[in-house]
Amino acid sequence: MRVFKTKLIRLQLTAEELDALTADFISYKRDGVLPDIFGRDALYDDSFTWPLIKFERVAHIHLANENNPFPPQLRQFSRTNDEAHLVYCQGAFDEQAWLLIAILKPEPHKLARDNNQMHKIGKMAEAFRMRF
């Protein structure tokens, strides 16, 4: 499994934060271990979603604050908030390739409706998926 990171997410997080997030992401996707800070994992696919985002199968994971993780007994689907989302995509040809694109915060649901921002994210996903 290979996890790539955009320049954007590298600017949003410290090296230590990005390393920890990457380790959690690998553990989650490869081993099926749900970290305490990971919540609902879903494609952007509602009627307001930018078409390129849908086409490139861009997804997001709700993120809890490390100081206030999701309750362990709460089912993943119910682990939601409007604090932060990890935006990512999977390779189109290589299912073991993943791209961590950005952290949307604050108000990630509102940011996901920003066509300018989502178009940029869609272009990053498109470039990655054309290669992987």
From Swiss-Prot:
Domain of life according to the entry: Bacteria
Name one process (GO BP) from the record. Answer: regulation of growth
Keyword set for this entry? DNA damage, DNA repair, Endonuclease, Hydrolase, Nuclease, RNA-binding, SOS response, Stress response, Toxin-antitoxin system
Coiled-coil regions, chain positions: none
Q: What is its EC number?
A: 3.1.-.-
**GO terms of molecular function:** ribosomal large subunit binding; RNA binding; RNA endonuclease activity
State a GO cellular component annotated for this protein.
toxin-antitoxin complex
Q: What induces it, per record?
A: Induced by amino acid starvation, glucose starvation, the DNA cross-linker mitomycin C (SOS response) and when translation is blocked. Induction is decreased in the absence of the Lon protease suggesting, by homology to other toxin-antitoxin systems, that Lon may degrade the YafN antitoxin. Transcription is negatively regulated by the cognate locus, probably by YafN. A member of the dinB-yafNOP operon; it has 2 promoters, 1 upstream of dinB and 1 specific for yafN-yfaO.
Would the keyword DNA damage be found if you checked this record's keyword annotation? yes
Pfam families, per this entry? YafO_toxin
Broad enzyme group: hydrolase
Q: What does this chain do?
A: Toxic component of a type II toxin-antitoxin (TA) system. A translation-dependent mRNA interferase. Overexpression causes cessation of cell growth and inhibits cell proliferation via inhibition of translation; this blockage is overcome by subsequent expression of antitoxin YafN. Overexpression causes cleavage of a number of mRNAs in a ribosome-dependent fashion. YafO binding to the 50S ribosomal subunit in the translation complex induces mRNA cleavage 3' to the region protected by the ribosome; YafO alone is not able to digest mRNA.
**Assembly and oligomerization:** Probably forms a complex with the antitoxin YafN which inhibits the mRNA interferase activity.
Please state what the protein is called: mRNA interferase toxin YafO
The organism's taxonomic lineage, starting at the top: Bacteria, Pseudomonadati, Pseudomonadota, Gammaproteobacteria, Enterobacterales
